[in-house]
Amino acid sequence: MMPTPDRRPDQAPDTTLPAPLSWWADTAHGPDRRDRPLPVDVDVVVVGAGIVGLTAATRLLAQGRSVLVLEARNVAGGVSGHTTAKVTAQHSLIYDRLTSRFGAAVARTYGQAQLRALAWIVDQTVGQSGQGGIDADLVTSDSYVFSSAEEDRGRLAREADAAQEAGMPASYVTQLDLPFPTAGAVRFTGQARFHPRKWLLALAESIEGLGGQIIEGVRVTQVHEGDPMIVESTAGQVRAAEVIIATHYPILDRGLFFTRLEPVRDLVICGIPAPEAAHLRHMYLDLASHHSIRPVGGVYGRPDELIVLGEHYRTGERLDVEERYEALAAWARERLGIKRISHRWSAQDVSTTDGIPFVGRYRPRAQHLWVGTGFGQWGMTGGTAAGLLLSDLIQGTAPDDERELFDPHRFDLRTIPALAHRNSVVAAHLIGDMTRASLNAATKELGPGQAEVCRVGTSLVAAYKDGDEVVHAVSAHCTHLGCVLAFNNAEQSWDCPCHSSRFDIDGAVLNGPAVAPLNQVAPPPAPPRPKRQNNGPPTHLT
């Protein structure tokens, strides 16, 4: 399906940024799966219809299990639909890091899990599997991590060596086809890029074809462990033998994942490059600046566009996100000659302290509750690998080395300083933001597009005035653990700086771990207008 016509790149001035909408969401649409009846019993409930959940559901159905997928929004509407969609086992410089810290065997186990995920995707796509394959615009492509700094050559060479030892198709190169100078790079050959929504929508269709059920618009609020497991949701209860939490950020606090995950956001733009960059056909990551580049198929008969990611920041930080988008657009103009931006969106992810995802039992003694999270911005292969491993764990066929490596409850003394820093940042926000907001009474009348957190009586209110001058007011406390929210002016959302929950201007949950919406409240009273001074009758000059 073609994108909406009013988003054509040539209909906007060079300096205009479009409203946030991912290229993937604009170019692939799925059926409505809302308002469907909830079954009473199934073998497996999968919570979340992103790449982890749909991969696990597909495998479990093929293994003879009955499966229900519950999705709070819509299929591929979360993180998986806002990625750059690099399908690669190259995850920055992870192989040298894993080898140095844990040994070559751990690096090999990690890498082989990513290659297995890559192969599973490629094997099912059109042009690879023959008739009946999924058409997800998959293109075989090389992947590069590069640097423009001469001093980084040693790091890149060590990564290439460690990746080769781990069985990766890696090499160190000094020549790239980028239109700006580089000092060197690590190249992985035989990787891929695809359209994530087309892939996931096709998986969803396949799941239903195999007898599985998918229901959108249903938010899971609680899971009671036992025999059977009881899943509570906004649509009622379901009994299951196994439950997989595949919600990107785990929604149940019992695993204490919120103390061990670092949330981040990146901004993404898409546009037509200058001729000197129009030949780019591979995937590129700048080691120093974290800018990521990949091509994507053109629309409206226009040339291919480039997707550019950058401006890495911690979710909920009090900063001007719109200004960050402008900075990313300026970088793309300078380096790649992108004049017009056709789409922009943001990508959210979480990382673990050791860089290895959490895939396995939700808590140490859990028997039938499972989780996959912490992919550190490499969710296309990392999330697929998690879905494959979760299905193997439930079936009792998981390889021991993968089960141990990705165990969510592994412990490494070397992660303690990072954990302490992570939670000190949360504590600083919890206390400091509360104090700052409590001292902020409503002192100004909001203009259209403006927002503030202010004290009204004994409560903190998050208020936003839209373009029609309607004030939307909600509680300023995140419903997860009560942190004070910050306004994201680019996406008109209230974001939590503690654990990355996000809410729209009327309080609906956009991202977890929060599962409850913000309470809507009365708008703060407008501050009194200053009185005009009466200095007597006006003086007339003659």
Regions found by a protein language model. Name each.
Residues 3-27, 93-99, 123-202:
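Flavin (FAD/FMN) cofactor-binding and adjacent substrate-gating region
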Residues 287-288, 314-419, 474:
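C-terminal catalytic lobe of FAD-dependent flavoproteins
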